[in-house]
């Protein structure tokens, strides 16, 4: 049984939360999954199913596109119109979607409040004080992780306000609205990167990760070894992802087409692949599958080191600006925006826990206040900006969104450490990857030098954002 000690220890840690057989049967029939040995979000509740059905059944308005054609919006096409170069198209798209959500706001409020009530009821049934405590405890996490994330990001909102002002200047706008936040600020990083060049640059960029990481990465990036399904072909799904099962090497599925974005995605997906591979090499089956909280750490660290590598080697100011703007957008959307989502989620659960009735007005007002606070005085609120919560499925996923923000913040902090400290930091990072699920996630992350119960790692990501802002502003002034 020794090889299964971590798994059994984790079960024992939560044994006090088990109810009697009859009570367990009842809560299982009602859909409780706090004890399920699968991802919490693989079991949708009836509230989540109803939310999905409502989104599917909605008829979205038509708008006039940049060519003057009448086009019907869908949730699939909405992001494209939201970032249109034509400001009127963007305004129409956001207004149409948020206006439609507002028309059905009481139904959306009912599905979300029902989900949150379930979260709270299941937590209380097992003796937890809050739903946050219950759903983090499944992975052995302290609620201080979420509190620290929200507090640290709130302490640095002045940087996001600077970014909004910068975006307004770059776009020549007197007022910045929600429909102005998604327009690309540059044409993107224009690089033609055939796979052999991408392989070489990724290996060179990730050299600070240490010899072990390099050896496995080189093996995986060699197509002859069977890790990669590299190029698009008929009947192949779009996008990119990494997949693994215990035993053989992981697989990385790409649709590589020789662009910078493809190279960055390749580095990202190999972060997932190497995490899984190193954990499988070091751990038995019961302890190799790392939790979602750690899933984006290696992937984002890879992306940061690749970005640093390219910035250090480019003399092209347009390319440099594009790389820097991309970094700003990654931190804005993944740390600032996902933290705003996490704060909304915590606030709404708090309403239920204190007995406050959840209404559409309360949800809209709460979200609107967050948008105003996060984006600051340079941002102009529109009538239905408080409705964005209504179509975001992650609010049904039981404290999930925060891990996007902590993952990127951890990746930035680890990239900083291996760049500055070299081999000792690389060894600590590799130790974390090899750990799989053999220790509590926070303990594993501390091996890599990151403690998310304290502000340091999150502050590092804020300083990266600030430094990048400074450089973009300087480039504009020249």
Label every model-predicted segment.
Residues 290-319, 327-329, 333, 407:
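Post-HExxH zinc-binding segment in Zn-dependent metallohydrolases
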Residues 118-125, 166-180, 215-221, 282-288, ...:
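Short, glycine/acidic-rich hinge or "gate" loops at secondary-structure transitions
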Residues 124-129, 133, 175-178, 238-249, ...:
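Active-site-adjacent bridging/hinge elements
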Residues 82-97, 134-149, 180-190, 247-260, ...:
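Glycine- and acidic
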Residues 127, 257-278, 299, 304, ...:
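Active-site recognition of the HExxH zinc-binding catalytic motif
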Residues 17-28, 46, 140, 169-179, ...:
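C-terminal, non-catalytic "cap/extension" segments appended to globular domains
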Residues 65-83, 191-267, 271-276:
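Active-site-adjacent "gating/activation" loops or surface patches in catalytic cores
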């Amino acid at each position: 049984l020794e090889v299964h000690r971590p798994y059994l220890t984790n079960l024992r840690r939560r044994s006090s939360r088990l109810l009697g057989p009859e009570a367990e049967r009842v809560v299982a029939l009602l859909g409780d999954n706090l004890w399920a040995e699968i991802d919490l979000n693989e079991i949708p509740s009836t509230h989540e199913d109803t939310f999905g059905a409502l989104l599917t059944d909605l008829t979205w308005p038509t708008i006039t596109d940049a060519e003057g054609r009448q086009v019907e919006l869908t949730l699939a096409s909405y992001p494209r119109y939201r970032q249109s170069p034509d400001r009127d198209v963007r305004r129409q798209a956001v207004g149409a979607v948020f206006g439609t959500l507002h028309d059905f706001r009481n139904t959306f409020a009912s599905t979300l409040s029902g989900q949150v009530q379930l979260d709270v009821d299941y937590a209380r049934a097992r003796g937890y004080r809050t739903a946050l405590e219950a759903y983090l405890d499944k992975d052995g996490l302290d609620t201080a992780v979420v509190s620290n994330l929200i507090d640290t990001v709130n302490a640095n909102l002045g940087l996001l306000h600077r970014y909004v002002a910068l975006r307004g200047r770059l776009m020549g706008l007197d007022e910045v609205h929600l429909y102005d936040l998604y327009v690309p600020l540059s044409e993107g990083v224009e690089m033609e990167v055939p796979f052999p060049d991408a392989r070489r640059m990724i290996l060179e960029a990730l050299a600070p990760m240490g010899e072990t990481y390099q050896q496995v990465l080189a093996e995986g990036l060699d197509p002859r070894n069977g890790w990669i399904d590299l190029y698009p072909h008929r009947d192949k799904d779009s996008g990119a992802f990494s997949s693994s099962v215990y035993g053989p090497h992981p697989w990385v599925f790409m649709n590589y087409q020789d662009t910078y974005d493809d190279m960055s995605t390749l580095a990202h997906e190999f972060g997932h692949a190497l995490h899984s591979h190193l954990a499988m090499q070091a751990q038995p089956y019961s302890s190799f599958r790392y939790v979602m909280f750690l899933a984006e750490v290696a992937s984002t660290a890879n992306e940061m080191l690749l970005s640093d590598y390219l910035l250090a080697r480019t003399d092209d100011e347009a390319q440099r600006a594009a790389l820097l703007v991309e970094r700003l957008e990654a931190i804005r959307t993944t740390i600032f925006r996902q933290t705003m989502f996490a704060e909304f989620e915590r606030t709404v659960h708090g309403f239920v826990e204190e007995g406050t009735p959840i209404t559409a007005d309360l949800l809209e007002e709460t979200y609107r206040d967050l948008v105003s606070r996060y984006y600051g005085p340079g941002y102009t609120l529109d009538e239905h900006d408080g409705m964005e919560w209504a179509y975001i499925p992650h609010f049904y996923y039981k404290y999930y969104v925060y891990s996007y923000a902590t993952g990127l913040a951890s990746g930035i902090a680890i990239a900083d450490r291996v760049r500055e400290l070299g081999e000792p930091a690389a060894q600590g990072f590799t130790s974390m990857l090899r750990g799989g699920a053999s220790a509590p996630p926070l303990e594993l992350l501390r091996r890599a030098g990151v403690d998310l119960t304290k502000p340091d790692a999150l502050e590092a990501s804020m300083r990266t954002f600030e430094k990048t802002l400074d450089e973009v502003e300087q480039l504009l002034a020249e």
